[in-house]
């Protein structure tokens, strides 16, 4: 009996100890919009390594849908159960920051710990909270939009890379007929698609054309905006006919019909093996070693500025998060841990850290079809990345109106009316945009 009692006593003490251990363990809840099974597994593997090195911290990876992030955060906030970390697109940062649910001091601490100089300038500028001047979230990865162009045919025609407006116009004049090309490019002109908005926005910013000025006035009919509309729509004379969007643009370039393509870094594998067609099957690329003959021009230089367009993903540390969350975020941006996440989609997960570029270049066999210079240019594309939606001094109302501009496809409609229908000019198109955006701003105020 004594031995039995002693055994029970020992077991009881062990259980008490284990209970105390469990209570003392810090739990960090990490929501990720990388929610596919294989991606969640990669996050969990990094978290497992972290927990092995930090046994007093438990990291719970919770997959969430991108479209439902705002609603789930709202529900969690109402229940006073916000997660500690959220992986989210840059478009969420301004709203969550304005709501006061992002721990900006924690984000600043992580960025400073990693080293501010290791981050690309563009992503850092995009996460600044204009109200506080602090970084509202930690940049993580993203994709870059660029002009992909036939470098071999540019050389044959004596053209310089399509960076400046003058360079692009010169290419539009000379490329048709060069090396069997039928057109210089495919222009986004479909009024029912967002592709024209994405391409035009880079053109506009490269001429310092923005929807609002510093005082919050609508500026859709400025000389800069009119000039951007004229430059963009004039390119249609050398472009594939008819309403076009990303699919037609991609196929025309892969088939050797057009010499320039506005597209994101997601095109990289398609230029090797052909993209999927709407009716099934893949494009059969007739151009030998198309990636090796393709150049990459992410930066556009206009008369009054320069710009790169793309998307940025961030890690937000939520208000009230345990300080351990900072340690977790930094871990996910460190060494092999960061590379393992980037490897999930190397074309769409371009590193924001300069120190991670060399490792990223090794993450896909498709990268072997591109020059090291092209891969460096892709990573460098972050330096001048800007978006209308994420201009640091725009407030929540202005950003909401920009979302309305995109949602109602105002820019694609105007481009179609100017370039295809001939029912508008750049001047009348800009005037119409001014009226529409002023009305939308009034609705939001």
Describe each model-derived feature in a short phrase:
Residues 90-144, 169, 196-199, 286-300, ...:
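Hinge/lid segment of periplasmic solute-binding proteins
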Residues 132-140, 145, 169-217, 224, ...:
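Extracytoplasmic/periplasmic solute-binding protein
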Residues 24-35, 57-62, 85, 136, ...:
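Short, well-ordered beta-strand elements
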Residues 271-273, 279-280, 285-288, 302-410:
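C-terminal lobe and pocket-closing loops
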Residues 172-174, 214-243, 285, 289-295, ...:
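Glycine-centered hinge/linker elements that transmit conformational signals in sensory
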Residues 27-45, 64, 398-403:
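Extracytoplasmic "Venus flytrap"
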Residues 45-120, 126, 152-163, 259-260, ...:
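Extracytoplasmic "Venus flytrap"/periplasmic binding protein-like
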Residues 1-29, 52, 427, 431, ...:
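Short, low-complexity disordered leader/linker segments with a strong preference
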């Amino acid at each position: 009996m004594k031995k039995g009692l002693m055994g029970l006593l020992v077991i009881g003490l062990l259980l008490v100890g284990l209970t105390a251990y469990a209570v003392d363990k810090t739990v960090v809840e990490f929501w990720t919009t990388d929610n596919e099974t294989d991606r969640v597994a990669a996050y969990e593997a990094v978290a497992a390594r972290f927990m092995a090195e930090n046994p007093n911290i438990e990291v719970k990876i919770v997959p969430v849908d991108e479209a439902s992030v705002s609603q789930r955060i709202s529900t969690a906030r109402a229940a006073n159960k916000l997660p500690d970390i959220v992986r989210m697109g840059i478009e969420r940062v301004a709203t969550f920051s304005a709501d006061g649910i992002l721990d900006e001091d924690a984000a600043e601490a992580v960025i400073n710990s990693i080293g501010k100089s290791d981050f690309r300038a563009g992503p850092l500028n995009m996460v600044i909270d204009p109200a506080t001047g602090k970084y509202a979230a930690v940049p993580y990865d993203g994709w870059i939009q660029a002009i992909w162009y036939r470098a071999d045919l540019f050389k044959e025609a004596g053209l310089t890379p399509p960076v400046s407006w003058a360079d692009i116009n010169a290419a539009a004049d000379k490329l048709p007929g060069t090396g069997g090309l039928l057109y210089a490019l495919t222009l986004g002109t479909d009024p029912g698609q967002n592709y024209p908005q994405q391409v035009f926005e880079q053109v506009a910013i490269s001429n310092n054309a923005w929807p609002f000025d510093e005082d919050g006035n609508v500026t859709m009919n400025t000389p800069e905006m009119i000039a951007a509309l004229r430059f963009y729509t004039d390119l249609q004379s050398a472009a594939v006919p008819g309403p076009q969007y990303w699919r037609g643009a991609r196929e025309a370039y892969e088939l050797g019909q057009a010499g320039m393509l506005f597209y994101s870094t997601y095109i990289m594998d398609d230029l090797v093996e052909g993209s999927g067609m709407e009716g099934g099957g893949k494009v059969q690329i007739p151009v030998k070693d198309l990636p090796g003959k393709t150049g990459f021009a992410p930066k556009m230089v206009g008369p009054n500025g320069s710009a790169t367009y793309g998307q940025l993903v961030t890690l937000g540390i939520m208000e009230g998060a345990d300080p351990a969350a900072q340690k977790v975020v930094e871990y996910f941006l460190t060494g092999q841990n960061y590379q393992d996440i980037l490897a999930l989609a190397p074309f769409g997960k371009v590193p924001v850290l300069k120190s991670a570029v060399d490792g990223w270049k090794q993450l896909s066999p498709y990268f072997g079809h591109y020059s090291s210079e092209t891969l460096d240019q892709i990573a460098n594309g972050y330096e001048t990345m800007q978006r209308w939606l994420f201009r640091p001094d725009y407030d929540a109302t202005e950003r909401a109106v920009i979302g309305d501009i995109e949602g109602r496809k105002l820019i694609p409609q105007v481009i179609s009316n100017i370039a295809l229908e001939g029912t508008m000019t750049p001047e009348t198109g800009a005037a119409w945009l001014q009226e529409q955006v002023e009305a939308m701003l009034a609705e939001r105020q």
